[in-house]
Amino acid sequence: MDLSTLMPQQRDIVTTLDRKLFVSAGAGSGKTFTLTRRILWALSPESGPFVDGLDQVLAITFTKDAAAEIRERVRAALVAEGMERAALSVDDAWISTIHGMCSRILRAHALELGIDPEFSVLEDPGDLMDLAVERVLSREGSAYGDLFGWYPLAGESAPGGFGGGTSVTSLLRVLLEKASAARNGFSDLRMLQGSVNLDGLADAYRGCMGITAGATKAAEAALAAIEAFEAGEKTVGNLIACMMACKPPRSSKNLPKEQVNLLKAEQADAFVNAYLALGSRATQQLLEIAHAVFDEYNQLKFDRSVLDNNDLLRLTYQALRDNPAMREDYGSRFKMVMIDEFQDTDQQQVDLINFLTGEGGRALCTVGDAQQSIYRFRGAEVDVFRRAQAQVEAAAACGSDAGRVVQLVKNFRSHAEILDYVAAIFDGTPQGRGGLMQGFLNLQAHDGRKDGMVATGVNRRQALLVAGGSTQERAQARAQAIARRFRELADAGQPVGGMVLLLGGMPRANMYADAFRAQGLDCVISGGSVFAQTQEAAAVRALVWTLANLADTAQGLAPLLACDMFSLGAQEFLALATAKDEQTGETRRRNIDAGLMSDKDVDGLRDLPLVDRARAVLRPALSRVGRDPLAAIARDVVNQSGWMVRLAGQGAEGRARAANVLKALDAIAEAEAQLGAAPRQVALAYDRFLEGKQAPGALNEEGGNAVRIMTVHASKGLEFPVVAVAECFSIKSGNAKLQSLRGDDGSISLVALPGQFPSARSADGAYIKGDDVAKEFKKYLGGSSAWLTSEYADDVCASDSAAGAWLAMSECETRLELQERERLLYVAMTRAREYCLLAMDAPVRSVNKQPVLDLRDDTDLTGRVLEQILPAGAALNGGMLCFEDSRRGDFELLALQDFACGDAAYTQNYSVEDGCFIGED
């Protein structure tokens, strides 16, 4: 087997088969090709052969598509190397996702494990989880009065907005997901409780006595309230009365601000802990009912003979742990175990894989890139990758043959200037400013790559900042600016089909698409969980509900006739809804379903072409319901309406919409295949399908001429000549009422703050409204000006403080989310081959009645990115980036209002309404 074309690092990976191998593979470094060659080498005579056949190779990757790609590459390479016999065994090889591997093991041992061997895999457990919540609440909800005093049942916000929409149903769903993913299920969950201790708060108020008259008055009132609470019954109502009576004094010359802030932090810690302690019955009830939901969910799965992905991992782990014979069998079966996308695994998956890798894990090869770990929301733990790397590096440093680390840093995808752009942000600048990522794996450009930049006179590295205005105005300005840049590239000869906009989220995808179309550029939304929002998905939904129940016109016939499939307007609907009384001759109203099935229209509303066409298509279709497959009927209606023909004539956008129609029809066919001839059940199943996070339909647009819009996650593994990146820079702070933290032992600690508050009476009998209590409590934790922050937590919080734990969990969540955002930006930028545009924005807030640019480094990357890419000390309107070849226009400031940043003042220069810079034509 010829290895001469491989780089030295690739050759090391391919030929190192006798020890644990850790591969850190940068973006665009050809890792899939290298893994394929490694399998071939292990099968080749030159290696021994190291393996007797593909059945001794286990290759795990993150997605089904990636597994299919590796299988096809292995098959083609085997054929090319003359190993046709081995190529025939590819379909039976252990090349799959980890869930696919688990499913295969469980089916093979189903009877001895007490599992139905015909089990189905529940890809989206959301519906069944919701059903479990609904059943338990309807059956047992009345027994949990304390809980419903803390949280609304569903879909409500607490007074004052403190609940943030938190509800019993949403919390139960969160706890169910956490328990399902835990190694030991619900027993791994532990709710932290507070304690009632106001001694520290009393001491803090005593420290204010005698300083000023105001401070003394505030301290006396607070101490009296605390004394009354300590002497009385410890109830939530009495605690609220005490809490509302404690008003910290204002700082002054004699009462330093630092002392007041410490008092506020002490008060926040004391009252939050006391409230959690006195309300502990509510949080215990939350765990109790969540446990009941967990049991109900498991019973529902058992009744339906389904397992979710967490079950697959947990049951396989338990089977190998508890069955020595199985563990011995699988532990010696594979001579090669390779895990691709290792950065997207979690500890449970690693523990499971360790059963399969032989003594000391010698068979294991892990491949990944910590800088591309962007699936934390699915449970990925990037620290698992880092710990594994550190362990193998330590073994290698000791001269041991127990492990080896290899880095793939040659990037075959991107131009050197793009890689320099990435490095400037994440590794640091030539001027010595440190980058966003510690331990950054820098990539080297491949000298032999073909340059795909067609446009001339355009720098490959560009950025823009939209400042001020509302969130919507900034988004519109951003979209207009990106579209204008793409238009300029197209005018300079750059193919539009190679341009893509990568977004951190898709809520505004249509707004960006409209901006591209306004510039005369075709545009398709090709990736992201937006399928349910498309007109095509809604149109097919209306069709299937019409076929299921013609009389249900609200969700069926009315939207069907109004959509692009039939395009009826007001006159046509009036014709369907108007009849003539045969006896009196007077006109009267009729239901539109009756109008559809009747030919008797009133004078002046007869012979309307759109009505005639709708009747000609839908009447025969309705007559077929119950005789023919519903999916076939729906497909015929779509075709006979002429909709697909019309879409085909609308260019790339029309083809993309047609792909959505076909995806919807396929979903109906799949539902019908599972449910049989049951139109209403098929319609309900399609509704559930829409509730899932579905990407738009896809047609083969190779060589097309449209800008594509997709999420960064959808772009993973892809590459494009021209990339713009937007909505990838900021996060929301982690202020959810329920916070959690997973320990090293797998246990999950929880702290739940209340979502709503009762009214109470003060010591003098005055009525205290619940929303006033909520506003007071909101001051303590979670807000931008909260009284208890990490700055004071060490001074006021005891080691067992639930308030301190919630704060630490919240700040940890925010920090981890921002780190994930850094990695998301890295993935987005490394999709670019020739050109990369970063589109950022920042709000303007009032500081001392002056508008100031608001760059918050704790929740937004924008300020740090600007610091990396702008020349040191440069103004925001300087127009240049920090690179030597930069020229004016590479950076653009779109100021939607006047503002200040540092010592510089900036004047509004852009109008969103006009879509251009002020003064431009």
PLM feature spans:
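Conserved motor-region signature of P-loop NTPase helicases/translocases
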Residues: M1-A76, D127, L131, S138, ...
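Conserved ATP-dependent motor core of P-loop NTPases, especially the RecA-like helicase ATPase domain
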Residues: T16-K20, Q56-A66, R71, R75-G237, ...
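Conserved ATP-driven helicase/translocase motor core recognized via long
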Residues: G26, Q56, A158-L307, D401-G403, ...
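Active-site-adjacent bridging/hinge elements
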Residues: L35, S103-R107, K264-A268, L287-H291, ...
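Core structural elements
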Residues: A93-R104, P152-S180, E288-H291, T316, ...
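Conserved helicase/translocase P-loop NTPase motor core
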Residues: I95-C102, M129, A222-A225, L286-K335, ...
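Anion-coordinating catalytic cores for phosphoryl-, nucleotidyl-, and glycosidic chemistry
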Residues: Y512-A513, C523, G528, K778, ...
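Conserved catalytic motifs of ABC-family nucleotide-binding domains
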Residues: N735-C812
